[in-house]
Amino acid sequence: MLEQMGIAAKAASYKLALLSSCEKNRVLEKIADELEAQMESILSANVQDVEQARANGLSEAMLDRLALTPARLKAIADDVRQVCNLADPVGQVIDGGLLDSGLRLERRRVPLGVVGVIYEARPNVTVDVASLCLKTGNAVILRGGKETHRTNAATVRVIQKALKACGLPEAAVQAIDNPDRSLVNEMLRMDKYIDMLIPRGGAGLHKLCREQSTIPVITGGIGVCHIFVDSSADIAPALKIIVNAKTQRPSTCNTVETLLVHQDIAERFLPVLSKQMAESGVTLHGDETVMQALHGPAKLVPLKPEELDNEFLSLDLNVVVVENMDGAIAHIREHGTQHSDAILTSDMHNAARFVNEVDSAAVYVNASTRFTDGGQFGLGAEVAVSTQKLHARGPMGLEALTTYKWIGFGDGTIRA
């Protein structure tokens, strides 16, 4: 089954690579319209998925990731329309020039070909990935989690209907709807057909893909994100940033999980933090210093060492007091996932040092980690957030779904 999907996807990719920007935008507009027109069928499938997931004991954080609402689906359709408005990178000449040999050389951006994506309980990924791949002339094979198989199937049917209406092969966007896990291992070895693989899920999925895939893999999306409250931080805006980074949508990978507090500000900062977190419903997981300093009003529990390496994806926040900037940077290097980290400070020398020494895909000064997102970065919907350094890093927009080819123009030109 998968080989036939691969053959069809590869054939579709050749056709997609030749489309003009106008032709690609036309199909994206059609997809957005169909998502809204077929909203009832998609939401009905999603309700079944959510009910099944709840019966299977999925956490509230996972249920939030899984659930679609009319507003969320409308936002997804609007994201597709925003992709239409983005500049098409395909065909762009990156650089080049006339060589001494007389050969005119240029480096031109081209589609990757076929992209494979394996993801878990995130139904929005189906549309986000499909829209970005189509905009860049790539075919895509999707393998969503069993928790979302009804939603994904309904969504892909809508996308394929739009493709067909625009005279494009339905195989440009395909989904593996069989929940058999052995198919994941089979997909990981489809290097004959798939040019790049992107896993979006937990650490176990990323480890499996890194170890078993014969396809180049882009990993990321696991966000043990930190905020360091420096000794010179302005407390009022710092609290506002922390509340946003923790509570706006706790189930996302760019949510802060560990707060590092400089010891020189801890005595003044921790009590007001506790009050603010109590109002926001956040449970604090405190180290020994925090446990001794606070006795309410926020719910406070002792921090377990292993929690420093985990994504809570919930209204829980580690709070650790550090001696200085060195301690904060060392902690992030040991426990971070190179996703998103921030410093809150009034000292621009310290800000510059933090930016230079923290090796993460996104580093912020006096801003929330929640900005690490393709839409927020002006990239449109993202295919993933890469925490590695090759071939892409951070939110992966359109350019991350392209490669380049060298093109030489001559006039009977030969090498001397």
From Swiss-Prot:
Membrane-crossing residue ranges in chain numbering: none
Pfam families found in the cross-reference section: Aldedh
GO biological process: L-proline biosynthetic process
Gene3D superfamilies associated with the record: Aldehyde Dehydrogenase, Chain A, domain 1 (3.40.605.10), Aldehyde Dehydrogenase, Chain A, domain 2 (3.40.309.10)
The protein's Enzyme Commission number: 1.2.1.41
Subcellular location as annotated: Cytoplasm
GO CC terms in record: cytoplasm
Pathway: Amino-acid biosynthesis; L-proline biosynthesis; L-glutamate 5-semialdehyde from L-glutamate: step 2/2
Domain of life: Bacteria
Enzyme class (EC, first level): oxidoreductase
A molecular function GO annotation: glutamate-5-semialdehyde dehydrogenase activity
InterPro entries according to UniProt: Ald_DH/histidinol_DH (IPR016161), Ald_DH_C (IPR016163), Ald_DH_N (IPR016162), Aldehyde_DH_dom (IPR015590), G-glutamylP_reductase_CS (IPR020593), Glu-5-SA_DH (IPR012134), GPR_dom (IPR000965)
Location, primary (coarse class): cytoplasm
Keywords from the UniProt entry: Amino-acid biosynthesis, Cytoplasm, NADP, Oxidoreductase, Proline biosynthesis
Catalytic reaction equation(s): L-glutamate 5-semialdehyde + phosphate + NADP(+) = L-glutamyl 5-phosphate + NADPH + H(+)
Function per UniProt: Catalyzes the NADPH-dependent reduction of L-glutamate 5-phosphate into L-glutamate 5-semialdehyde and phosphate. The product spontaneously undergoes cyclization to form 1-pyrroline-5-carboxylate.
Family according to the record: Belongs to the gamma-glutamyl phosphate reductase family.
Name of the protein in question: Gamma-glutamyl phosphate reductase
Designated gene of the protein: proA
